[in-house]
Each structure stands twice: as C-alpha cells, then as structure tokens.
Amino acid sequence: MMTNFKFALKNLKVNFTSENIDKLRFYIEKVLLFSDRFNLVSNNVRNFDAMLLHALDSVSGLPIVKDKNPRQVLDVGSGAGFPGIVLALFDRCRKYVLLERSNKKAIFLKMISLELGLENVEVLEHNVEEEQNKYEFITIRAFGDIRKYANILGSILKSGGLIMAYKGKFDKVEFEMSYVKNLFDKVEIKSSELISDKERYFLLLYDYKC
C-alpha cells in the first residue's frame, strides 16, 4: 500500500523524502494508537491502509495550495489532522494553522506536531465563529455541507483569498455550489488528480463578497 502511496505522490508531482514517508507512517500509527483516547477516527477506518487513503486524499490538495502559494493556510476542523498535518508534513516551507474546537483532538494535534517536528504548525482550540484573524487560504475536509459555513468561512477570508473544500460526488458538490456561488467572486469545481475508483472533487471559493 505504501508503494502505491509513493506512486500517487509522484503523479501529483509532490516531492517527498524517505523521512517524509517515515514520519507519515509514524503519524498514522499514532492516530490508530490514540484514537480511542482522543476520539480521533471512527471504528470502520481504524486500520493502517484506511488511514493511508485519508492521508492520500489529504495530500491531493497540495498542488492547489502550491499553485495559489499562500504564506499560511488555515485548516478548519482539523480533527485527527487530515488534511492539516499531512499537508504540513509534505509542505514544510509554509505555515499551517490547525483550528479544532475539540479539546481532546487539539491536544492530540499539538502532541503529534511536536513529535513530528513540524515547526510550521500552530494549533488553535476554539470554534471557527470565534476566529478573529483573516487568512488567504482556508481548507476544510469532512466538514459537512458548505452552505452552512460559507458566510462564516468567508468572513475570515482575506480579500483575494481562496477556500478549498474537499468533496465527494459531483452532483452533491454542484448542488452545494449553486447555493453559495453568489457569495463569492468566483466558484469552481476541480476534479482530484488522484487515480481512484471514488469520486473526489475540490470546491474552490474565491474572494468573499459580503
């Protein structure tokens, strides 16, 4: 499975070293080890291969991040660290701010970022509604329907900024997009570059209007 992961990274044109791979393996093992204690992932994905697929899905957004080239990225609702920790691991030159409201998960994120030596990671523990800073790039994954949070996320998006939402089936993404398109200067659906039997898309929201 790890061989397939490396092959996928090459297809995504994501540079990596043996240290990156070793640290990713360490991270996944820690997620599995502490899942019960910190309520990190559901029972049906508590195995290494399933976690590796989550990591691969997470890193598939990196080409979009690099194309936009923000100084820092805000990952909202980081949970166990997908995609925030994974992106930070393969993109060490950029700061990643992980926003997580759960105390248990925030503790885990702080612990694992220290153990991985991710000096480019900062963990914030509060609700997204309480965030005061503005960001030029925001990521969300497994965050539910974008319609519920579009205005909240837009309010902390810098002028000219971009929200990148990891999404699944095209019909659902298109439906969500139809409700939020008037809130942003530009809305785009971009297919994932991963070779997979599952539908994966990114909903990209550019420059909040309100």
Swiss-Prot record:
<comment type="function">
    <text>Specifically methylates the N7 position of a guanine in 16S rRNA.</text>
</comment>
<feature type="binding site">
    <location>
        <begin position="128"/>
        <end position="129"/>
    </location>
    <ligand>
        <name>S-adenosyl-L-methionine</name>
    </ligand>
</feature>
<feature type="binding site">
    <location>
        <position position="77"/>
    </location>
    <ligand>
        <name>S-adenosyl-L-methionine</name>
    </ligand>
</feature>
<keyword id="KW-0489">Methyltransferase</keyword>
<dbReference type="InterPro" id="IPR029063">
    <property type="entry name" value="SAM-dependent_MTases_sf"/>
</dbReference>
<keyword id="KW-0949">S-adenosyl-L-methionine</keyword>
<keyword id="KW-0963">Cytoplasm</keyword>
<keyword id="KW-0808">Transferase</keyword>
<feature type="binding site">
    <location>
        <begin position="100"/>
        <end position="102"/>
    </location>
    <ligand>
        <name>S-adenosyl-L-methionine</name>
    </ligand>
</feature>
<dbReference type="GO" id="GO:0005829">
    <property type="term" value="C:cytosol"/>
</dbReference>
<comment type="similarity">
    <text>Belongs to the methyltransferase superfamily. RNA methyltransferase RsmG family.</text>
</comment>
<dbReference type="Pfam" id="PF02527">
    <property type="entry name" value="GidB"/>
</dbReference>
<feature type="binding site">
    <location>
        <position position="82"/>
    </location>
    <ligand>
        <name>S-adenosyl-L-methionine</name>
    </ligand>
</feature>
<keyword id="KW-0698">rRNA processing</keyword>
<protein>
    <recommendedName>
        <fullName>Ribosomal RNA small subunit methyltransferase G</fullName>
        <ecNumber>2.1.1.-</ecNumber>
    </recommendedName>
</protein>
<feature type="binding site">
    <location>
        <position position="141"/>
    </location>
    <ligand>
        <name>S-adenosyl-L-methionine</name>
    </ligand>
</feature>
<dbReference type="InterPro" id="IPR003682">
    <property type="entry name" value="rRNA_ssu_MeTfrase_G"/>
</dbReference>
<dbReference type="GO" id="GO:0070043">
    <property type="term" value="F:rRNA (guanine-N7-)-methyltransferase activity"/>
</dbReference>
